[in-house]
Amino acid sequence: MPELPEVETVRRGLQPVMEGAKIVVAEARRPDLRFPFQPDFVARLQGQVVTGLGRRAKYLMADLASGDVLLMHLGMSGSFRVIKPDNDAAPGEFHYPRGKDTTHDHVLFRMSSGADIVFNDPRRFGYMKVIARNALEDEPLLRGLGPEPLGNEFDAAMLARSCEGKATSLKAALLDQRVVAGLGNIYVCEALHRSHLSPRRIAATLATRKGEPTDHAKRLVGAIHTVLNDAIKAGGSSLRDHRQTTGELGYFQHSFKVYDREGETCKTPACGGTIKRFTQNGRSTFWCPKCQK
């Protein structure tokens, strides 16, 4: 499933053709994706100007002039394709190869900018929903999400407060969207390695007895910022076929320190340890037992 950097790559690819443009035609070519489309889904989109395109955690959010917001999630296999008369690009296409097969083109937005934006989703785990902006706080899909890891409010003090007293593992805490929104398995593994913290470490150790952030918390927040920013600059990670707006692959997987490197030598200078993998909360965890404590 695409994580925050991949979704941000998609947002940046769609922004030039969506922001400020009108949705001239909206089509839902089947009754559902992961969830059924709302009965008025098309009617609430057609003719609306997109005033802004943002992101919350792993969700894309298109602000409409009507006061509604189009909430979009890529799911496991969803991708957007931008079709122009003189160009065909895939902004942040993730997981499935881009081809000419339109069988799984389930949603179309024809924009006044001259672009057709097509949502393709073979496995149909993605979803779209139109929500009134003043009702966003009550939306079940968004309610309870923690701070954005790249936002100004996310710092060591906030992370320490969120983890204070938690007996769960550090990795499980970071994957909890209530603690921090948008992190997934890949970037949690990478951030823990770069901060030299064990994924098995108890989350509560990020806070002192007085609730202040420890050095561990400060290192971890710095590593999260670095990993996410580096991944966004690289266009995300191409585990199968993640593409940028130019159609090029994302390249951050070439910078992985631990993820999917089981049995290989740790890249930490002077470490010399071997990357191990174990199952943690149903997911593969990659780490270096020698330098992550």
From Swiss-Prot:
Molecular-function annotations in GO: 8-oxo-7,8-dihydroguanine DNA N-glycosylase activity; class I DNA-(apurinic or apyrimidinic site) endonuclease activity; damaged DNA binding; DNA-(apurinic or apyrimidinic site) endonuclease activity; zinc ion binding
Record's keyword terms, sorted: DNA damage, DNA repair, DNA-binding, Glycosidase, Hydrolase, Lyase, Metal-binding, Multifunctional enzyme, Zinc, Zinc-finger
Domain of life the protein comes from: Bacteria
InterPro entries, per the entry: DNA_glyclase/AP_lyase_DNA-bd (IPR015886), DNA_glyclase_Znf_dom_DNA_BS (IPR015887), Formamido-pyr_DNA_Glyclase (IPR020629), FPG_cat (IPR012319), MutM-like_N-ter (IPR035937), Ribosomal_uS13-like_H2TH (IPR010979), Znf_DNA_glyclase/AP_lyase (IPR000214), Znf_FPG/IleRS (IPR010663)
Entry EC number(s): 3.2.2.23, 4.2.99.18
The UniProt record lists the keyword Transport: no
Zinc finger residue extent: FPG-type: 257-293
Active site: 2 (schiff-base intermediate with dna), 3 (proton donor), 58 (proton donor), 283 (proton donor)
Entry-linked Gene3D superfamilies: 1.10.8.50, MutM-like, N-terminal (3.20.190.10)
Residues that coordinate or bind DNA: 104, 123, 166
Catalyzed reactions: Hydrolysis of DNA containing ring-opened 7-methylguanine residues, releasing 2,6-diamino-4-hydroxy-5-(N-methyl)formamidopyrimidine; 2'-deoxyribonucleotide-(2'-deoxyribose 5'-phosphate)-2'-deoxyribonucleotide-DNA = a 3'-end 2'-deoxyribonucleotide-(2,3-dehydro-2,3-deoxyribose 5'-phosphate)-DNA + a 5'-end 5'-phospho-2'-deoxyribonucleoside-DNA + H(+)
Cofactor note: Binds 1 zinc ion per subunit.
GO biological process terms held by the UniProt record: base-excision repair
Requisite cofactors: Zn(2+)
Membership in a protein family: Belongs to the FPG family.
Listed NCBIfam families: fpg (TIGR00577), PRK01103.1 (NF002211)
HAMAP family linked to this entry: Fapy_DNA_glycosyl
Subunit architecture: Monomer.
Function: Involved in base excision repair of DNA damaged by oxidation or by mutagenic agents. Acts as a DNA glycosylase that recognizes and removes damaged bases. Has a preference for oxidized purines, such as 7,8-dihydro-8-oxoguanine (8-oxoG). Has AP (apurinic/apyrimidinic) lyase activity and introduces nicks in the DNA strand. Cleaves the DNA backbone by beta-delta elimination to generate a single-strand break at the site of the removed base with both 3'- and 5'-phosphates.
Protein name according to UniProt: Formamidopyrimidine-DNA glycosylase
